[in-house]
Amino acid sequence: MRHRLFIPAATALLFALAACTQDELAGDNRLPEGEYPVVIRATGLSVEATPLAAPSTRASVDGDWQGVTSVALKMGDAVKEYTVTASTDFKSATLSRENDPYYWTSRDPITISAWWPFNNADITQMPAVKVAEDQSKLADFQNSDFISAENRKVEFNNPTLEFTHRTARVTIELKPGTGFTSVAGATVILVSLSADNGNPTAIKTYNASGNTYEALTAPQTVAAGKPFIRVELGSGTFYFRPQNNVVLEAGNRYKYTVKVNATGLTLEGCTIGDWADGGGESGEAEDLGYSIQNDGSYTVYN
């Protein structure tokens, strides 16, 4: 005996509407709400390392995620703290949030901003870059770094966010010149810096290794003719005055090779590029003379 299946008209209409809705979801890339949390792979920091003789502690300044435990992540108008899980080589990281994460609502790209460090009192605002005045200790040098990824498109199938440094990196290599057989024990200080956002006008550098010194600064321009590098060696104080404006841009590294002479500082070369070394320029500083104090010490301006 045959049985016939009768479907009421209203039920048939519901089936038809459901089919249309599924087709529309597939067509506009929408996803079910609350099922696809936003998890991002963080990359982009340069893998340029500190010199081999330096301590092995790693940080973002070395292109390393080991010292970063969380970042502020902005999507739309909301900002949330995301946990950082570094890769085994610490050169990339996974950004995720266990409770109340962002969710993908479609397969379309999303716009994300993220930064570290952030202000716990107000995580919604990216803090201004403010570096330490005394960076002679490794921890203070490393903690002066600021990183961010601003208004970046993140793809659903490849959710990657590229970070960059918000600071400029200055590296100074000293060499003994006329009147010196060694430059060991020198103190190197960057001077004539901008005080914007409460930044120091002078920064004591970190002795990274041997005769190499480093410091991180906020982006700024040091005017031509102003003292920029101060070297204290023995009883003498020496200055290097650039002949052109020094434009310190975020994410760039500026490497100066400076020869210390009894009559002043000679610039042997200046390399300007990304956080790792790049192309640049070279030249010499003028000898502007020196003065002798009553105690027998002398200051050379060059």
Predicted regions and their residues:
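Sec-dependent N-terminal signal peptides
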Residues: F6-A12
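Sec-type signal peptide cleavage vicinity
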Residues: R2-F6, L17-N302
